Swiss-Prot record:
It comes from the Bacteria. This is Ribosome maturation factor RimP. GO terms for cellular component: cytosol. The keyword Ligase does not apply. Required for maturation of 30S ribosomal subunits. It comes from Citrobacter koseri (strain ATCC BAA-895 / CDC 4225-83 / SGSC4696). One of its GO terms (biological process) is translation. It is found in: Cytoplasm. Keywords: Cytoplasm, Ribosome biogenesis. HAMAP family: RimP.
Length: 152
């Protein structure tokens, strides 16, 4: 997925502190609004609990206070990826081959921006998703948002 320049910079800044605490930085989202939000997704082999989120929040807050890369007021949220896990990298898609995903595209493909199907393959910066029995290929740079579809 194409991250904004700010999201790329933030990812570079906070990856090491998050990993030093023993967590994987799954991804970040910066949502601009009246009150902007910096959302950080973390994970670990043992799962994530509230204390884990608090630890990462304190560590990341300290880094952001020193570096001060965000020029507007914002709320910091740290959470697990959840059942509808967001997908940010080619590695995420590869890890979840065979799983169902919902994609929202930046630019429409075949007059559609929203797609849902099963992740079939990852090849560099392209993914193949089987939608209604037909393989569709998408550039990661054209994916605005992607989430796993939870099944109960």
């Amino acid at each position: 997925m194409g991250l904004s320049t700010l999201e790329q910079k933030l990812t570079e800044m906070i990856t090491a502190p998050v990993e030093a605490l023993g967590y994987e930085l799954v991804g970040i989202e910066f949502i601009r609004g009246r009150t902007s939000t910096l959302r950080i997704y973390i994970d670990s082999e043992d799962g994530i609990n509230v204390d884990d989120c608090a630890d990462v929040s304190h560590q990341v807050s300290a880094v952001l206070d020193v570096e001060d890369p965000i020029t507007v007021a914002y709320n910091l949220e740290v959470s697990s990826p959840g059942l509808d896990r967001p997908m940010f990298t080619a590695e995420h898609y590869a890890r979840f081959l065979g799983e169902e995903v919902t994609l929202v595209l930046r630019m429409a493909v075949q007059n559609r921006r929203k797609w849902q199907g099963v992740i079939k393959a990852v090849d560099g910066e392209m993914i193949t998703v089987t939608v209604e029995g037909k393989d569709e290929v998408f550039a990661l740079s054209n994916i605005q948002k992607a989430n796993l579809v939870p099944h109960f």
